[in-house]
Curated annotation (Swiss-Prot):
GO terms for molecular function: betaine-aldehyde dehydrogenase (NAD+) activity; metal ion binding. Binds 2 potassium ions per subunit. The active site is at 162 (charge relay system), 252 (proton acceptor), 286 (nucleophile), 464 (charge relay system). GO terms for biological process: glycine betaine biosynthetic process from choline. It catalyses: betaine aldehyde + NAD(+) + H2O = glycine betaine + NADH + 2 H(+). Pathway: Amine and polyamine biosynthesis; betaine biosynthesis via choline pathway; betaine from betaine aldehyde: step 1/1. Keywords: Metal-binding, NAD, NADP, Oxidation, Oxidoreductase, Potassium. The lineage of its organism: Bacteria, Pseudomonadati, Pseudomonadota, Gammaproteobacteria, Moraxellales. This is Betaine aldehyde dehydrogenase. HAMAP family: BADH (MF_00804). NAD(+) binds at residues 150-152, 176-179, 230-233, 254, 286, 387. Disulfide bonds: none annotated. The keyword Acyltransferase does not apply. Pfam families: Aldedh.
């Protein structure tokens, strides 16, 4: 324990001692070892972060959009220079394969920051003539101080997805990372400061989600909450935000997304997409296509093709370059996923491959769950209805297009969906009837910076990324101007 570094809070451009006197540990899920100890924020610390953010935001908003853009672009350059270093830290903290964190997590997060840095100068109002002597114009003004609450599966990417549009629009952000994977958010704060961000514009306060989340959502100064996490927690955050000061919210919540394989689909492509849609990042992706609908005529061949591909997955030490499937992010989460797998077995689903914990050699020390594929699934099974957030694919057979659309939509979730077919008319026809906010045709999973992402139904409120999100971090002020005489009726 003496070699374990203790991390403080990051407030006003520097590390500061938390006042709670409490700490918690970050655990490497590949072997169960403690990799860091973190101080936990108190309500007093949240107040300090808010005051700091208020001060920094005034300075930040007073800068020209071009000045803000240049600072954010510097942060992008630093992120890319330190890609490998940040990726190694992300792998230690999350258990995700380094082959993934080094090519996806930091890269795509930096892409989003670069995108919004470029848009900072594009925030503008409009001018509308009313008559010869009068017109009105609008201003898009920053909200002020906003808060981001991150999830544990994509720590630095989520921190960037939330902070990039907020900062580009002239706001300050207080960010609370997941207590399971808090380390790279602190590194991001350092990078923002190094790039020239005024002190207080990006503060990081880590600790227990229930306490800190409540303090942030109820704080009267904070104007918006952007939350990524589970549905039930999201409902509480939204209720708290509305019940305190009618805060604006963005909610990126859970999913149980359908992947529809059509009868004319290329079998190899369909199997490749299904495996990526379920086992990338060890299955810990909110948009995973965990309900795979397959025509009965293709079922046997499709299952065989999927199993062949799952056998090629390389499970191992996440720091090893050839590993493409690491442990789950925490041991408690591993137990939750294993309980779902047992539920699937008990409810009559057939295990085609996997079906338990990986215990061979060094894997026994980590939170490893074997990539698992269930067949003979029904819509009523828990593994089909509930978000597992792990490497568990459920294959369901269907007969008609009308049937599969109805069943795909028969869920309280609506985050993502996909269709695999060689008939482009069919692809659009099906997708247009699917109740989901992010859809893919003949591919899966890519979320470029330019594309708005978010869910229907209980999968979320609002969007992240894309041009539309920038507007969500501003408010519109309307100003009418009268150049002529003013006539009173009194």
């Amino acid at each position: 324990m003496s070699d374990v570094q203790v991390h403080q809070l990051y407030i006003h451009g520097r590390y500061v001692e938390a006042t709670s006197g409490k700490t918690f540990n970050s655990i490497n899920p590949a072997n169960g070892e403690i990799i860091a100890t973190l101080q936990q924020a108190s309500e007093q610390d949240i107040e300090a972060a808010v005051k700091s953010a208020q001060q920094g935001q005034k300075i930040w908003a007073a800068m020209t959009a071009m000045e803000r853009s240049r600072i954010l672009r510097r942060a992008v350059d630093i992120l890319r220079e330190r890609n490998d270093e940040l990726a190694r830290l992300e792998t230690l903290d999350t258990g995700k394969a380094y082959s993934e964190t080094s090519t996806v997590d930091i890269v795509t997060g930096a892409d989003v920051l670069e995108y919004y840095a470029g848009l900072a100068t594009a925030i503008q109002g409009e001018q509308v003539p009313l008559r010869e002597s009068s017109f009105f114009y609008t201003r898009r003004e920053p909200l002020g101080v906003v808060a981001g609450i991150g999830a544990w599966n994509y720590p630095i990417q989520i921190a960037l997805w939330k902070s990039a549009p907020a900062l580009a629009a002239g706001n300050a952000m207080i960010f609370k990372p997941s207590e399971t994977t808090p380390l790279t958010a602190l590194k991001l704060a350092e990078i923002y400061t190094e790039a020239g961000l005024p002190d207080g514009v990006f503060n990081v306060v880590q600790g227990a989600g229930r306490e800190i989340g409540q303090w942030l959502t109820e704080h009267p100064v904070i104007e918006k909450i952007s939350f990524t996490g589970g549905v039930e927690t999201g409902k509480k955050v939204m209720a708290s935000a509305a019940g305190s000061t009618l805060k604006e919210v963005t909610m990126e919540l859970g999913g149980k997304s359908p992947l529809i394989i059509c009868e004319d689909a290329d079998l190899n492509r369909a199997a490749d997409i299904a495996v990526m849609a379920n086992f990338f990042s060890s299955g810990q992706v909110c948009t995973n296509g965990t309900r795979v609908f397959v025509p009965k005529s293709l079922l046997v061949d499709f299952e065989k093709a999927v199993v062949e591909r799952v056998k090629r997955i390389r499970i191992g030490d996440p720091m090893a370059e050839d590993t493409n499937f690491g442990p789950l992010t925490s041991f408690p989460h591993m137990e939750k996923v294993l309980s779902f797998i047992e539920s699937g077995k008990q409810q009559g689903a057939k295990v085609l491959i996997g079906g338990g914990r990986a215990t061979e050699g060094e894997l026994a020390k980590g939170a490893y769950v074997l990539p698992t594929v269930f067949s003979d699934c029904t819509d009523q099974m828990a593994i089909v209805q509930e978000e597992i957030f792990g490497p568990v694919m459920s294959i369901l057979s269907y007969e008609t297009e009308e049937e599969v659309i109805q069943r795909a939509n028969d869920t309280t979730f609506g985050l993502a969906a996909g269709v695999v077919t060689q008939d482009i008319s069919r692809a659009h026809r099906i997708i247009h009837q699917i109740e989901a906010g992010i859809c893919w045709i003949n591919t899966w999973g890519e979320s470029p910076a330019e594309m708005p992402v978010g869910g229907y139904k209980q999968s979320g409120v609002g969007r992240e990324n894309g041009l539309t999100t920038l507007g969500h971090y501003t408010r519109i002020k309307s100003i009418q101007v009268e150049l002529g005489d003013y006539q009173s009726i009194f």
